């Protein structure tokens, strides 16, 4: 099984588990989110350790083993991206299973279980025409000011949406053209989405245009831009002007 096949299978299985937990009805609200996080995390860790015992794992829901910093291959996972959306019965939450090699986003899968979708790096490039005005996905609950300013400068239509994975995949599958975040994220929030976006032929970088670097000692990675390649220069200039 290739790394991409493994990422896809694990993300899909974790998504099936999360749907079953939510359908069970035993918990609601924060308790539901906590149970989903914990059980999906354990499943992902168990599957990755069984299939790739020499690799390290960085997960939002597990104790960080800093020995990973010296490793070439590190799986970076978020078992439930969008806990609020999951607990509220919405569909814009995700499972992230990403592999960074030498600090770069390499292989990944992002599952949107409530939509029965799994996106992976072995899907290959996707090409969608940019609509005018361009469409920008922003946080439903806490859209950063810079995203609003950039959206205004570009004349973009803003589309509120939940989790980071859901927003990134909206760009991957052509439902949006730009995803800009500057409100604080960690490596597990965007490693898998960035890898899938890059494999799909999109632009993915920090908001200053610099590369996304993973497996750092401090996993804080506070900003992200995913957009159509043909929009990248325009969006980066609008970001610089808005800061």
Task: Kindly label every feature range from the protein language model.
Residues 1-9, 123, 129-131, 237-243:
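Short, low-complexity, intrinsically disordered N-terminal peptides in bacterial proteins
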Residues 1-80, 149:
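N-terminal subdomain of lithium-sensitive/metallo-dependent phosphomonoesterases centered on the IMPase/IPPase/PAP
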Residues 14, 18, 48, 83, ...:
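Residue-level signal for inorganic ion chemistry
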Residues 59-61, 122, 162, 208:
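Short loop/edge segments at beta-strand edges and connector loops
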Residues 67-69, 88, 128-131, 215-219:
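Solvent-exposed alpha-helices and their adjacent loops that cap or buttress functional pockets
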Residues 68-123:
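DPxDG-like acidic metal-binding loop motif
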Residues 131-243:
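An extended, acidic
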């Amino acid at each position: 099984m290739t790394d991409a096949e493994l990422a896809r299978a694990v993300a899909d299985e974790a998504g099936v588990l999360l749907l079953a937990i939510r359908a069970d009805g035993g918990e609601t609200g924060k308790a539901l989110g906590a149970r989903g996080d914990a059980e999906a995390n354990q499943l992902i860790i168990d599957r990755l350790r069984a299939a790739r015992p020499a690799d390290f794992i960085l997960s939002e829901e597990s104790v960080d083993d800093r020995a990973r910093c010296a490793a070439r291959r590190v799986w970076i996972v978020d078992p439930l991206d969008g806990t609020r959306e999951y607990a509220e019965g919405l569909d814009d939450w995700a499972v992230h299973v990403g592999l960074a090699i030498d600090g770069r986003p390499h292989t990944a899968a992002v599952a949107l279980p409530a939509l029965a979708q799994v996106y992976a790096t072995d899907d290959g490039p996707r090409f969608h025409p940019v609509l005018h005005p361009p469409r920008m996905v922003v946080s439903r609950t806490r859209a950063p000011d810079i995203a609003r300013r950039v959206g205004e400068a570009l004349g973009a239509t803003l589309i509120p949406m939940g989790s980071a994975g859901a927003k990134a995949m909206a760009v991957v599958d052509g439902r949006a053209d730009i995803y800009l975040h500057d409100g604080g994220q960690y490596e597990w929030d965007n490693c898998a989405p960035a890898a899938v976006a890059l494999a799909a032929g999109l632009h993915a970088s920090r908001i200053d245009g610099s590369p996304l670097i993973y497996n750092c000692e401090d996993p804080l990675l506070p900003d992200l831009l995913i957009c159509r390649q043909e929009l990248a220069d325009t969006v980066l200039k609008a970001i610089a002007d808005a800061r």
